[in-house]
Amino acid sequence: YKQHRDPKSLDAALAEAAPNGVDGNFENVGGEILNAVLRRMNAFGRVALCGMISGYDGVPIPLSNPSLMLTQRLRVEGFIVSEHMDVWPEALKELGTLVATGRLKYRETIAPRIEDAPQAFLGLLKGKNFGKQLVKLL
């Protein structure tokens, strides 16, 4: 998404990546990313909302075409991690195994000093990091 900052470019990239449309989307970003994915969703697709970082700065996140949720008969559901703490140990074990075996890969951006934390946080809100944003404390 970082190299596709405008809707046309993002639409083209998604069309290339998913020429047959999208059946499921795990959404953490919102904003233009969500708008672009909704335009590619297949009928009866599912959207799991787990974050909307594009709106964490307090600016409302507009949907460019909310009627797509109706016309495509999409199922959109929000998930809050803290509501599923009963399965946390099981999920942690399974995800840990996937990371350890290389089947699940992660990326992170590390700010080298605690003094860099404010700038790292602002960069997180502006999409300047890649993956999880961390700050080295020691």
Where are these regions (language model features)?
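Non-transmembrane alpha-helical segments in soluble domains
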Residues: F26, L38, G96, P118-L122
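Glycine-rich phosphate-binding loop and adjacent beta-alpha segment
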Residues: E32-L104, L137-L138
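Adenosine-nucleotide cofactor-binding segment
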Residues: Y1-A36, S82
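C-terminal capping/lid region of NAD(P)-dependent oxidoreductase domains
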Residues: R103-I110, P118-L138
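Short, amphipathic alpha-helical "lid/cap" segments that border enzyme active or binding sites
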Residues: D11, L92, I114-P118
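Short acidic-hydrophobic, aromatic-tinged amphipathic segments that line or gate anion-handling sites
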Residues: Y1-D6, T109-D116
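Short conserved AdoMet
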Residues: P19, N42, N129
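CheY-like receiver
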Residues: A13-A17, L98, A120-G123
